[in-house]
């Protein structure tokens, strides 16, 4: 079976999926799994194409102490027990910086460039690069493809991505990038099959999960996003604050004595829903909690989504549809309903029955614009990009080393 392995590596887990290439560019998901609890309680879990369990096993802490070790566990299980040797590996890489506006085949030069952006995505980029380096070292001829969360937003008008600071900083790469691009790209490619006319128009997509952002699409292309230079900006998230006055950061350093490293860790790990509520970074727990600060965190999240929707509608000069996606957007009917209330000025209403069913179309019959729920599939986008790059180079005589 010709297959593509998709890897999404984080600080405490490595998520992976295997897709079979069926010809004519068609891909079928065969395996979905992850190694989580890295460095604490390592565990491999995996399921097959029909969600049948394939693995659920624990490992000693010392055997899975970092991301490369977790990759070794996943790769060894795929190779030794399922006899799967992928013809290529596609990776989610959060930050492509100014260098990359599309997926790219990875070599040591690409890795060196991507290492320059670690400071711009310290929560993600180092972990994204770890399995890439490991595979380059152990299987140097195995094609690897980097797919960037920033690339989809490179269609913005230039003026949208400046900061009002000296121009030289823009030249150096200090600019607005936007993130969750693989998710938005999937929604943009799915919309023509859901509502062809709407897909040609002005659409706001809300990617609401532990990481959260929103994107303005015009004709399926990103023209504006709530995130900027880093994935700290925009909406409040599980542990990240979203939009914040830079003066707050100066205050943390000058008045609270935080070092730059401490301030960075604080902003990425101790803020957002977790910081505001003091309860949890998980929206499900906050919705179920009776703690007043949990309610405050939910209220603030909903308010900021509504506020940013107004900004994006202005960028689009109108609105033809609104789309929810990602964990909260796909699964929380209460959050969707509350956000719809925030959008009443746009003529948005929801059908309570369809919303409770998590239907594809959840807007009411009297809504001025349709409201959709479209489950995202970033892994499929990565697999498609990886296959496309392989096909592009198929005329060459490069020998592909299989993992064996």
UniProtKB/Swiss-Prot annotation:
Name the cofactor(s): Mg(2+); Mn(2+)
Extract the Gene3D superfamilies matched here.
3.30.420.40
Metabolic or biological pathway: Metabolic intermediate biosynthesis; acetyl-CoA biosynthesis; acetyl-CoA from acetate: step 1/2
InterPro entries listed in its UniProt record: Ac/propionate_kinase (IPR004372), Aliphatic_acid_kin_short-chain (IPR000890), Aliphatic_acid_kinase_CS (IPR023865), ATPase_NBD (IPR043129)
State where ATP binds: 15, 207-211, 282-284, 327-331
Q: Which reaction does it catalyse?
A: acetate + ATP = acetyl phosphate + ADP
Might you give the EC number(s) for this enzyme?
2.7.2.1
Binding site residues for Mg(2+): 8, 378
Major location category of this protein: cytoplasm
Similarity field = Belongs to the acetokinase family.
Query: What does the record note on quaternary structure?
Result: Homodimer.
Question: How is this protein named in the record?
Answer: Acetate kinase
Gene (name only): ackA
């Amino acid at each position: 079976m010709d297959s593509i392995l998709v890897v999404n590596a984080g600080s405490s887990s490595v998520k992976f999926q295997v897709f079979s290439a069926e010809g004519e560019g068609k891909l079928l998901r065969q395996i979905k799994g992850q190694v989580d609890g890295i460095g604490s309680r390592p565990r491999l879990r995996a399921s097959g194409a029909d969600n049948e369990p394939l693995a659920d096993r624990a490992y000693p802490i010392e055997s899975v102490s970092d991301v490369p070790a977790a990759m070794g566990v996943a790769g060894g299980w795929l190779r030794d027990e399922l006899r799967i040797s992928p013809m290529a590996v596609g990776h989610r890489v959060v930050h492509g910086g100014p260098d990359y506006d599309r997926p790219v085949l990875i070599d040591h030069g690409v890795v060196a460039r991507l290492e320059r952006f670690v400071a711009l995505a310290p929560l993600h980029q180092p972990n994204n690069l770890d399995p890439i380096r490991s595979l380059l070292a152990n299987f140097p001829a195995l094609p690897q493809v980097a797919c960037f969360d920033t690339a989809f937003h490179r269609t913005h008008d230039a003026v949208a991505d400046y900061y009002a600071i000296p121009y030289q900083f823009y030249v150096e790469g200090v600019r607005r990038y936007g993130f969750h691009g693989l998710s938005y790209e999937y929604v943009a490619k799915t919309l023509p099959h859901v509502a062809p006319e709407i897909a040609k128009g002005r659409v706001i997509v809300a990617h609401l999960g532990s990481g959260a952002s929103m994107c303005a699409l015009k004709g399926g292309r990103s023209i504006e996003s709530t995130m900027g230079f880093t994935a700290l900006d925009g909406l409040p998230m599980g542990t990240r604050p979203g939009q914040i006055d830079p003066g707050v950061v100066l205050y943390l350093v000058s008045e609270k004595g935080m070092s730059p490293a401490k301030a960075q860790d604080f902003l990425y790990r101790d803020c957002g829903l977790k910081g505001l509520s003091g309860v949890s970074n998980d929206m499900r727990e906050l919705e179920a909690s009776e703690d007043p600060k949990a309610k405050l965190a939910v209220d603030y999240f909903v308010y900021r989504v509504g506020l940013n929707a107004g900004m994006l509608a202005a960028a689009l000069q109108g609105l033809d549809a609104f789309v929810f996606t990602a964990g909260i957007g796909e699964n929380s009917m209460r959050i969707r309903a509350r956000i719809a209330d925030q959008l009443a000025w746009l003529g948005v209403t929801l059908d309570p029955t369809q919303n409770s069913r998590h239907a594809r179309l959840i807007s009411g019959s009297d809504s001025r614009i349709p409201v959709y729920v479209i489950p995202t599939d970033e892994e499929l986008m990565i697999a498609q990009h990886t296959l496309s790059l392989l096909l592009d180079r198929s005329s060459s005589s490069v020998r592909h080393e299989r993992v064996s």
